[in-house]
Regions:
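Short amphipathic alpha-helix that is part of the acyltransferase structural core
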Residues: 1-35, 130, 140-168
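Conserved GNAT acetyl-CoA-binding A-motif
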Residues: 97-109, 226-238
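Conserved beta-strand-loop-alpha-helix junction that forms the acyl-donor binding cleft
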Residues: 106-114, 236-247, 263-264
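Conserved active-site tyrosine of GNAT-family acetyltransferases
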Residues: 115-120, 124, 250, 255
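Conserved catalytic-core motifs of GNAT/GCN5-like acyltransferases
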Residues: 125-138, 238, 256-264
Length: 264
């Protein structure tokens, strides 16, 4: 039987539909989640697709995201079969080396048994992990703060880069909001949305304001903006498991952990 992995930067509409159906089927069968963008970026400078075909039928796939030209974050969507998974991991490692990647992370739900068994056998532990949290608006009863969150201007970009410890991507900058007092940039976050699903990313408060309640007010103000746009919105965010202060903030503001992603 002919097996082949074909690497692509763009997908046809039929391929997009096939990949979405395969992902949804495996999520139901395995009871796990995949860390993937909601859309398939067209001509994306940072997305790679590896399509695993058997007799011309796509049976599994790999999606890799590279935002800095050096680090690849990849997700494998495949049946829960050991040899199948190992073959895809080997293909990913080989291809990443050809692209000149300095670092590769395989991102997996911590309940994905085949992947866990694969890394456990090799004595490999996650480099780090993230909790994926979802806002429970039905049970949230607190009054939301209403700080003014603004789009950054050219004059804000240097301060924003210092706060983020790096220059944001142009496409991220379009969705970035900042909070300022006395012309000082004190906090930032980014709101991404697809249809009625909203993600809060890149949430950073300047060190001098941490632990003083500003982060809570900025988060509440972002929630207010989203819910005023769509009262039925699904809102999510992610936080590293070691960041207990942020995790506590999110959980006291109506977010509950849905699952955990491990980065190997």
């Amino acid at each position: 039987m002919n097996k082949k992995i074909n690497w692509r930067r763009q997908l046809t509409q039929l391929e997009k539909q096939t990949l979405t159906e395969l992902k949804n089927k495996e999520m139901i069968k395995q009871g796990t989640f995949y860390k993937l963008e909601q859309t398939f970026p067209e001509e994306s400078a940072y997305t790679y697709y590896g399509l695993y075909r058997k007799e011309q039928t796509i049976q599994a796939y790999i999606v890799g995201y590279c935002f800095d030209g050096e680090t690849l974050e990849a997700t494998i969507v495949a049946p829960n079969v050991g040899p199948f998974f190992e073959e895809l991991v080997q293909e990913l490692e080989k291809q990443a080396a050809l692209w000149g990647m300095k670092e590769v992370f395989l991102v997996m739900d911590d309940k994905q048994s085949v992947g866990l068994n694969y890394f456990n056998r090799q004595g490999i532990v996650p480099a780090f992990s993230e909790q994926y949290l979802v806002f429970q608006r039905e049970t949230y009863s607190q009054a939301l703060a209403k700080l003014t969150l603004l789009r950054p201007r050219v004059a804000d970009l240097d301060s924003l880069a210092r706060l983020l410890e790096g220059t944001p991507l142009p496409e991220d900058l379009q969705r970035t909001l900042i909070y300022k007092e006395n012309n000082q940039l004190l906090a930032t976050l980014r709101l991404d949305h697809f249809e009625n699903e909203w993600g809060i990313y890149g949430f950073v408060v300047t060190k001098t304001q941490r632990g003083r309640g500003l982060g809570r007010q900025v988060l509440q103000s972002a929630l207010r903006m989203i819910l005023e746009n769509s009262a039925s919105a699904t809102i999510f965010l992610e936080v590293e498991t070691e960041n207990q202060a942020a995790l506590h903030l999110y959980q006291t503001e109506g977010f509950q952990v849905r699952n955990q992603y491990n980065y190997y």
